Every structure is written in structure tokens, then in C-alpha cells.
From Swiss-Prot:
Belongs to the glutaminase family. InterPro entries: Beta-lactam/transpept-like (IPR012338), Glutaminase (IPR015868). Keywords: Hydrolase. Substrate binds at S70, N121, E165, N172, Y196, Y248, V266. One of its GO terms (molecular function) is glutaminase activity. It comes from Mycobacterium marinum (strain ATCC BAA-535 / M). This is Glutaminase. The gene is glsA. Pfam families: Glutaminase. It is an enzyme of class 3 (hydrolase). Its EC number is 3.5.1.2.
Length: 320
């Protein structure tokens, strides 16, 4: 288990400082195309960091449970890569950024009907269909089981959020049928869409999400439970996808300015991973125009900068 290169005192201070500085940051609005998400208090704001040696630091509303939403994609992706290997995932779904909005179907039309990325909705629905299962309930059991293994505790679904999403997910149903027509879905299309919607409706806290990210940072072993969740060799593939497409159409800018693999969700959550060191998670419902939490982005970026976590940082002194 690799130790962090940053002291616990510095991490704790960075978390508290980021929460204090960003808690009054304005801008953005709750996702309103999923009715129940529009009702979440917009002032909620939590920040957490989990290290690879099992330390967890929190500030603000870090115990509030929110919908995992699109962040769930990385854990289903990890499950499928673990079961089928990175090559099969790449062949059957793709491993490239689309350059389009997360719910766009343009990539399907422009790239021979292939989803391209497992972190946009089309690719995520396709990835869900690749879970090696004997039926829908087995598929669901494995997906929520993977989320629970990453978090180190039993994760559960919000039936209220799921019902709200199932009542409005017409676009995703259409995507599932497009995938069926092109041959890039691997179970019944409506089963895949239903399970995908369910996986987005599970509840986590920022403390949970930080541990989930720290499991990736720790090479696939949960730093709290000690359980190996995915093979170390499969972690880089997940982190690569997070770098390319994790914060929607802002992914390139995020890599340029923050330099950490990350994944956001329209529930207001965001997780970023510093391999071998720690993960940062933040939550606040108001989103920017592309679907990323305004406060969460600011807090994660501040912590990454304070602790000099960016993957592209070059050690050494500045030249005169």
C-alpha cells in the first residue's frame, strides 16, 4: 500500500480551506430535467478526501446522500473491464472521447454506429449490457455490488429518484434502441436502459465517493476494507477514460487546468483521483451549462492545486 506524499495535516487544512472559500460561490442551477433533482437544496456543499492509507477528511455536508448519476459509469466500466478485459470493452463499446454532450447520439451517427466512449450515455448503456449476467436482477446485483465494494459499505438505491428518472428517460430509451439497431448492445435494450437508470439512482455521500475514488488511487484495493475490487492492471484503463471524458465536454479543459482524472454527475457530485495518493470528492447541486457542479469543480481544483496533485506537474524548482 503506497503512502501518500502529502501530510495528513496539509490534506485536512486543504479540505477545510476549500470548503470555506467555495461555499458562497454562486452560479449554475440544479438539473431540472429529472424532477426530483430540482428539489435538492442548492445550498448543500460537502467536500471529502480519502487517502490510500485509509484516512478520510471531510467538511460541510459530507454526510448528505445524493444521487450518484453519471459517476456510476466508472464503476460499471471497472466491473466490465474486470470481467471481459480492456480489449473487449474497446472493441464492443470504444475508448475515445466523442467531443459531444453526454446525452448526444451524434457519435453513433458519425462513427459507424459505435458509442465511442463508455462515459457518455450511449456507451454507458452499452457497457451495462456487457456485464456478464444471467438476467436483469443478476446484472443489477453485480453493479450495485461493485459500487458497494468500491465504497466499502452497502450502497442502496433511492426508489424515489429511480421512479423520477424512469418516468423521464425517453431519450435514453431511444439511445438503447439505436444501439440495438447498430449491434452495439448486448442484452435486451430496455433491460439495459432500466439497469443503467437504476445504477444512476443509488445514493452516496462525499465520504463514500472519496473512498470509491481512493480505491482506484490505491490500485484497485479499497483502503478501508482492504478488499481487492479490481486488478491493478485494469485501473489505468478506467483512469484514462475519466481523463478523456469524465467531466463531459469540459474534460480537455479540466486536464489542462487541474490535471487529474475525474468524473462528474448531474446529481452534483464530482470525484478526482491522484493515483498512488488520494481521491477528492465534492458535492453541490447547482450545475454549469455542461452538467458539472460549479462548487464541486472549484473545491476539487483548489485542493488539487494546493497539494500539487496534478499528474502533469514536473518536480523541481522553477528556472530563474
Amino acid at each position: 500500500m503506497a503512502p501518500t506524499s502529502v501530510s495528513n495535516a496539509r490534506i485536512e487544512k486543504a479540505v477545510l480551506d476549500a470548503h470555506e472559500k467555495q461555499k458562497n460561490k454562486h452560479g449554475g442551477k440544479n438539473a431540472d430535467y429529472i424532477p426530483i433533482l430540482a428539489q435538492v437544496p442548492s445550498t448543500l456543499f460537502g467536500v471529502s478526501v480519502a487517502t490510500v492509507d485509509g484516512q478520510v477528511f471531510t467538511a460541510g455536508d459530507a454526510g448528505y446522500e445524493f444521487a450518484l448519476e453519471s459517476i456510476s459509469k466508472i464503476f460499471t466500466l471497472a466491473l466490465v473491464i474486470e470481467q471481459r478485459g480492456p480489449r473487449e470493452l474497446r472493441l464492443k463499446v470504444g475508448a475515445d472521447p466523442t467531443g459531444e454532450a453526454f446525452n448526444s447520439v451524434l457519435a453513433l451517427e458519425l462513427h459507424n454506429d459505435k458509442p465511442m466512449s463508455p462515459l457518455v450515455n450511449a456507451g454507458a448503456i452499452s457497457t451495462t449490457s456487457l456485464v456478464d449476467a444471467v438476467g436483469p436482477e443478476d446484472r443489477w446485483r453485480q453493479i450495485v455490488g461493485a459500487q458497494s465494494d468500491f465504497a466499502g459499505r452497502q450502497i442502496s438505491i433511492s426508489e424515489e429518484i429511480n421512479a423520477s428518472e424512469q418516468a423521464t428517460n425517453f431519450h435514453n430509451r431511444a439511445i438503447a434502441w439505436l444501439l440495438r439497431g447498430s449491434g452495439y448492445i448486448y442484452c435486451d435494450p430496455m433491460e439495459a436502459c432500466d439497469i443503467y437508470t437504476r445504477q444512476c439512482s443509488t445514493l452516496v455521500t462525499t465520504a463514500d465517493l472519496a473512498v470509491m475514488g481512493a480505491t482506484l488511487a490505491n490500485g484497485g484495493t479499497n483502503p478501508i476494507t482492504g478488499k481487492r475490487v479490481i486488478a491493478r492492471k485494469n485501473v489505468p484503463h478506467v483512469l484514462a477514460e475519466m481523463t478523456m471524458e469524465g467531466v463531459y465536454t469540459r474534460s480537455g479543459d479540466w486536464a489542462y487546468t487541474v490535471g487529474l482524472p475525474a468524473k462528474s454527475g448531474v446529481g452534483g457530485g464530482l470525484v478526482a483521483v491522484a493515483p498512488g495518493q488520494l481521491a477528492i470528492a465534492a458535492f453541490s447541486p447547482p450545475l454549469d451549462k455542461v452538467g458539472n457542479s460549479v462548487r464541486a469543480q472549484a473545491a476539487v481544483a483548489q485542493i488539487a492545486d494546493t497539494l500539487q496533485l496534478g499528474l502533469f506537474n514536473v518536480p523541481g524548482e522553477e528556472d530563474e
